[in-house]
From Swiss-Prot:
InterPro entries noted in UniProt: EndoS-like_Ig-like, EndoS_F2-like_TIM-barrel, Glyco_hydro_18_chit_AS, Glycoside_hydrolase_SF, LRR_dom_sf
PROSITE patterns: GH18_1 (PS01095)
Protein name: Endo-beta-N-acetylglucosaminidase EndoS2
Positions of the catalytic residues: 186
This protein's GO CC annotations: extracellular region; host extracellular space
Enzyme Commission number(s) of this protein: 3.2.1.96
Subcellular location, record wording: Secreted; Host extracellular space
Main subcellular location: secreted
Species of provenance: Streptococcus pyogenes serotype M49
Ranges where the record places region carbohydrate-binding module (CBM): 678-832
Length: 843
């Protein structure tokens, strides 16, 4: 989607000839420049009580799907600018219809001493309250973070932030007589907020939440956030979500996909981890006069010269799509909102104007300000209220009144909530007698039935469809349960079912599931307890104790027994996966190694009845190891990826088996008598001299092939110290093309080189000054060749004749081409020895 979410921009009033040709388009951040009004106003007690009742009804969902709108104060006829002049006489907040549940006071271009403010608190609040509309003041987040307004007058300390929060609530809520506070948080395209500013804003937000909102001391006020930001980009939201009444997400313009709601769907997957669907509102924008490119959303119908009323039609609009959209999980959304509701009914400028700019504005007649009757808002509210998904859950849905009450409390009150709820439902108490209606919660993830002593029957028909997938079932204290039928629910265990409490059980059916009822499994014990409970009331029969036809699901084992394997030296090829890493386990961790073992497992029986389905096959049960990989490290640290080894000589391998993503098994494999595992003696070696770059030279001893050493010439040498005398048996050079970070051509490989040790083993290099040491190390006369390299292969490997040395040098004598050669790592392989042992071996 190639557009910026420049949402909720406000357009300055277009005043007479001076501003006629230009759009004063400002970001929603214009809120941040508005100072709170200092004058205190007493709101009548009646209005306070009415407002409190409205807030309670809204918060409890008694108003149905909500419709809210942002009214731009400078478009109210009472508003005047700093010059004292009226700006737009066409509209007034007083005419906002009852279909608007929440009206946001979105102020800008309105002077602090404008008559608008007295009209708001003395007239508009009362009038709108009487029709059932709550009013909420909107401010920008910069009012909280120290950038603008009151926040500039308070220090960023716990005490300062607490005082600032109180001042904000007083100035913007109490003194204006409104019903809550809305804080706008958007992306900053210039002068971006810092993490420190966001941290302060969050601290102040939390202090505000102590004062107002659902968790505040004054619960008669709403606390709302509106934003353009997704969850991952909004740390303030994540920190305050639990205190919000509503989250209003601005989705102005297309959101992708055929239905233009792809982004909304994606965002909701994250939002539902923090808020309920009943707190989530999505918003569109009416067309703002003189809007230019970047602020043209096309959320309402475009101007049609043949249909003057086109702007009042909602058919085919994005606004209607938003009204109809619902989350697929969690529940029904709270509702929708509109920005610039004072432009309701005005058609959008045609798409042919989509590239117009504020500096060269191509005007259209829809840019003119006109009176609105809020037709679109009325239609959208009606559309939502007539949506059958918002019908209240009744006795037809859930006959048992006690069950219905608990479901409404936890899931929501609307029919559409039932099929979307995807969390945990906990049912408790002896008032519930009938579970009919539970099946409607098709996406329920966990069901807890606790102390339902008057529920006598549980059957698959009464349980959610999700029980056939992976939903969890908990049953505790079901003392009155007589019939338990969990047949065909794909249950893999009976975990969560307190079978000891089902003391009145007369029959059960757990057949046609995926249970492991083998002798040592936990589910076998639970089965025997169930049978005992039935036997306390009647004789056990096939009809009253069904458990047959199980098809346990197979899993890869979490661990494998073999920690050290062995092959004889027989010159034969062996497969490590086949011999040491194999088998399948049930959910209860019963291990079945092969088809023969599975056949034996199938013969298992309880009370003479075979519990595994006769048509269940080993192929359907077993796990396939085809995607598994085996990484072998030989005694000389040579590495290969293969599950097959040929036992031709004594050798030892360290074996790592991975499932393609992670290592699942580690073992040691000996062939014949095995071999001593060597070490890379050069890993972490100290570079003591080089003809090249000293810092770069350290890279060849860091154990990583993601970096490389540049020789910067056809010849080069590096001298290094192993720290002590060691026994070296092999050496290995990883050439340029082994680089794991940057694809490197083999033409950059080293082709010729020499590995050397210091002749004089008694010399103390530490006592030399830097100049003398470099001269000494660079002199070929002081070194003895112990190996030569004459091949430009990717990994050059060669044996050494049990070389004893502490100080080594590697000389590059030529590359594979005219390019300067490179290499990534140098290894000296062998065993570490104490100085005493090394000296003894040398003698």
């Amino acid at each position: 989607m190639d557009k910026h979410l420049l949402v909720k921009r406000t357009l300055g009033c277009v005043c007479a000839a001076t501003l006629m040709g230009a759009a004063l388009a400002t970001h929603h951040d214009s809120l941040n420049t508005v100072k709170a009004e200092e004058k205190t106003v007493q709101t009548g007690k009646t209005d306070q009580q009415v407002g409190a009742k409205l807030v309670q009804e809204i918060r409890e969902g008694k108003r149905g799907p909500l419709y809210a709108g942002y009214f731009r104060t400078w478009h109210d006829r009472a508003s005047t600018g700093i010059d004292g002049k009226q700006q737009h006489p066409e509209n007034t907040m007083a005419e906002v219809p009852k279909e608007v549940d929440i009206l946001f006071v979105f102020h800008d271009h309105t002077a602090s001493d404008s008559p608008f403010w007295s009209e708001l608190k003395d007239s508009y609040v009362h009038k709108l309250h009487q029709q059932g509309t709550a009013l909420v003041q909107t401010i920008g987040v910069n009012e909280l973070n120290g950038r603008t307004g009151l926040s500039k007058d308070y220090p960023d300390t716990p005490e300062g932030n607490k005082a600032l929060a109180a001042a904000i609530v007083k100035a913007f809520v109490t003194d204006r007589g409104v019903d809550g506070l809305d804080i706008d948080i958007e992306h900053e395209f210039t002068n971006k907020r810092t993490p420190e500013e966001d941290a302060r804003a969050l601290n102040v937000f939390k202090e505000i939440a102590q004062l107002i909102g659902k968790n505040g001391s004054d619960k008669s006020k709403l606390l709302i956030m509106d934003t353009t930001l997704s969850v991952e980009n909004n740390p303030i939201f994540k920190g305050i979500a639990e205190d919000l009444d509503y989250l209003l997400r601005q989705y102005y313009g297309s959101q992708g996909g055929e239905a233009e709601v792809d982004t909304i769907n994606s965002d909701w997957n994250q939002y539902q981890n923090y808020i309920d669907a009943s707190q989530f509102m999505i918003g569109f924008s009416f067309f703002e006069e003189s809007a230019s490119k970047g602020n043209l959303w096309f959320d309402v119908n475009e101007y049609d010269p043949n249909n003057p009323e086109k702007g009042k039609d909602i058919e085919g609009t994005r606004a209607k799509k938003y009204a109809e959209w619902q989350p697929s999980t969690g529940g029904l959304k709270a509702g929708i909102f509109s920005y610039a509701i004072d432009r309701d009914g005005v058609a959008h400028v045609p798409s042919t104007y989509k590239n117009r700019t504020s500096t060269n504005l191509q005007r259209h007649e829809v840019d003119n300000i006109s009176h609105t009757d809020y037709t679109v808002s009325r239609k959208l509210k009606t559309l939502m209220t007539e949506d059958k998904r918002y019908d209240v859950i009744d006795q037809k849905d859930i006959p048992d009144p006690a069950l219905r009450e608990q479901i409404i409390q936890q899931v929501g009150q609307y029919k559409g909530d039932l099929e979307r709820y995807n969390k945990t439902l906990v049912l408790t108490g002896d008032k519930i007698q009938n579970l009919k209606g539970l099946e409607k919660l098709s996406k329920l993830q966990k069901l807890e039935l606790r102390q339902l002593s008057n529920v006598k029957e549980i059957t698959p028909e009464l349980l959610p469809e999700s029980m056939k997938k992976d939903a969890e079932l908990v049953m505790v204290g079901m003392t009155g349960l007589e019939k338990l039928n969990l047949s065909g629910l794909n249950r893999q265990t009976l975990d969560g079912i307190d079978v000891n409490s089902i003391t009145h059980l007369t029959s059960f059916d757990i057949s046609h599931n995926s249970l492991d009822l083998s002798e040592k499994s936990e589910d076998r014990k639970l089965l025997m307890t169930l049978m005992e409970q039935v036997s306390n009331h009647q004789k056990i029969t096939v009809k009253n104790t069904a458990f047959e036809n199980q098809k346990p699901k197979g899993y890869y084992p979490q661990t494998y027994d073999t920690k050290e394997g062995h092959y004889d030296v027989d010159n034969a090829e062996h497969d490590i996966l086949t011999d040491f890493v194999f088998g399948t386990v049930t959910k209860r961790n019963t291990f079945i190694g092969d088809e023969e073992a599975f056949a034996i497992y199938k013969e298992g029986a309880v009370d003479g009845r075979q519990y595994v389905s006769k048509d269940y096959t080993y192929e359907a049960f077993r796990k396939d190891y085809k995607g598994y990989k085996v990484h072998l490290t030989a005694s000389n640290l040579g590495e290969t990826v293969t599950s097959k080894v040929t036992a031709t000589t004594d050798e030892t391998y360290l074996v790592d088996v991975s499932d393609g993503e992670k290592v699942v098994h580690h073992m040691k494999l000996n062939i014949g008598s095995g071999a001593i595992m060597m070490e890379n003696l050069a890993k972490g070696a100290k570079v003591i001299g080089t003809s090249g770059d000293f810092e770069q030279a350290k890279k060849i001893f860091d154990g990583e092939k993601s970096d490389r050493f540049f020789t910067w010439g056809q010849t080069n040498w590096i001298a290094f110290d192993l720290g002590e005398i060691n026994l070296a048996k092999e050496w290995r050079l990883f050439n340029a093309e082994t680089n794991t970070e940057i694809k490197t051509d083999s033409s950059l490989n080293v082709a010729k080189g020499r590995l050397q040790i210091l002749k004089d083993t008694t010399i103390d290099l530490e006592k030399m000054d830097i100049k003398n040491r470099k001269e000494y190390l660079s002199n070929d006369e002081n070194w003895t060749d112990v190996a030569q390299m004459d091949d430009a292969k990717a990994i050059f490997n060669s044996k050494l004749s049990n070389v004893l040395s502490r100080y080594w040098r590697f000389c590059v004598d030529g590359g594979a081409s005219s390019y300067y050669p490179q290499y990534t790592e140098l290894q000296i392989l062998g065993q570490r020895l104490s100085n005493d042992v090394a000296n003894t071996l040398k003698d």
